[in-house]
């Protein structure tokens, strides 16, 4: 099976699975929804580890290296970088279209005040499920790209709580409700993670999570809405102040 076809099929299956799980858990709010998704990830990790015939168990699966466009494998890392950039631009384009559409405005209304949005006739459940399904589809596509790049798929890593925490931190630190926020968060967390792992080494396994916590505390204290949002607000305040000073 071609990895390109497998990528689309995996995306469709992930979207279907997300629809089912989302329908069962999306009615939960706040920390309860978060706890439900974390618990589900742990259950899936256990199932994946014990389903050795499909996943390779705790050792994972090695992907044979057969370079070529048809095999979605390339000898040059630069080519992978271009393909990854293409995925990023495509994802940002979809996010931008949703953000500027009626669906995007409805999602903002749900985020700000769910009960008020429901009272105004917004189909909260349907839109939440749509957001979850789209997210799962694109996450699956990028997961295929990652597997083709690393040539290795490991269930303990794919379903790890640590990875989920990293993704959440990227969004929170970068700025919720913006497309540029997660990019800024990833640009900060990814090199920080690499540096801390190299600096601390295996002797201090897990200690880097303390640094994540410190970064999160600093952001909550001084940039509560995230880097992107706070920077935009600071720029607007500066422009307003400059205009007032110019008018005397």
Q: What function would you assign to each model-found segment?
A:
Residues 1-248:
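Transmembrane alpha-helices and adjacent helix-loop boundaries
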């Amino acid at each position: 099976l071609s990895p390109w076809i497998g990528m689309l099929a995996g995306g469709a299956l992930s979207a279907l699975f997300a629809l089912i799980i989302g329908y069962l858990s999306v009615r939960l709010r706040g920390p309860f929804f978060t706890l439900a998704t974390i618990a589900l990830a742990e259950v899936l990790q256990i199932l994946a580890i014990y389903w050795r015939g499909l996943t390779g168990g705790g050792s994972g699966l090695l992907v044979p290296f057969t370079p070529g466009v048809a095999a979605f494998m390339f000898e040059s890392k630069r080519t992978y970088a271009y393909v990854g950039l293409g995925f990023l631009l495509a994802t940002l384009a979809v996010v931008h279209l949703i953000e500027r559409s009626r669906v995007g405005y409805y999602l903002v209304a749900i985020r700000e005040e769910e009960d008020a949005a429901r009272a105004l006739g917004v189909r909260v459940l349907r839109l939440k499920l749509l957001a979850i399904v789209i997210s799962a589809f694109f996450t699956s596509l990028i997961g295929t790209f990652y597997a083709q790049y690393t040539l290795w798929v490991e269930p303990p890593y794919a379903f790890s709580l640590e990875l989920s925490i990293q993704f959440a931190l990227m969004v929170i630190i970068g700025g919720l409700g913006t497309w540029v926020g997660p990019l800024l968060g990833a640009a900060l967390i990814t090199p920080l993670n690499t540096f801390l792992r190299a600096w601390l080494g295996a002797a201090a396994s897990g200690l880097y999570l303390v640094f994540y916590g410190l970064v999160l505390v600093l952001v909550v204290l001084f940039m509560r809405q995230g880097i992107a949002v706070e920077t935009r607000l600071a720029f607007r305040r500066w422009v307003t102040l400059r205009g007032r000073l110019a008018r005397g």
